[in-house]
Amino acid sequence: SYRNIGLIVHMAYEWGQRIGDMRLLTWNNIKWKDKQLYLEQSKKRREVFLPIGDDLFSMLQKQKEDFGFQDYVAPQVRPARGVYVPYTLTNVSKYSNCVIKLAGLRQELQLMHLRATAITEMNDAGVPINQIMSVSGHVNPQSVQPYIKHTFKSANFALNQRNSNKTLDKNTKSC
């Protein structure tokens, strides 16, 4: 079953986080009444607090019903010596490649690109850099720059914003 691998991948993309951090999530990371994830990122030990959308929240509730008897949100589906443990990064990659192949997706897809894709999509949507940083855990704008890609969508957004401001200026009467 690839269910838990799928959940790890979905959470990484949804929240723009590293696969390694998602595979290690425990139930204590989820604040159910606030629909919020608390995460201390492994790379720099930065804390992020992320909202849990309705669809993902429903998935996590179902996951809790099925796997709530142990610590990890998405452990390996078979216990190792009677204990449920997180997937290794190697196994996440191996099983994800199987899913990619079974789904008929391009083999060059890489899980490590999910975080960069999420950050690029936030930028393309016009999300201010400080808000992107609150999701990604970066502490300065320069560290986010490598994720910011010059895409048609972001150029289109920028020019449309500029043009809408010109229209506003024309419609504003001066004294």
Model-derived features with residue positions:
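C-terminal catalytic core of Y-nucleophile DNA break-rejoin enzymes
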Residues: 42-62, 70-97
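Short alpha-helical segment immediately N-terminal to, or the first helix within
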Residues: 11-12, 25, 121-122, 135, ...
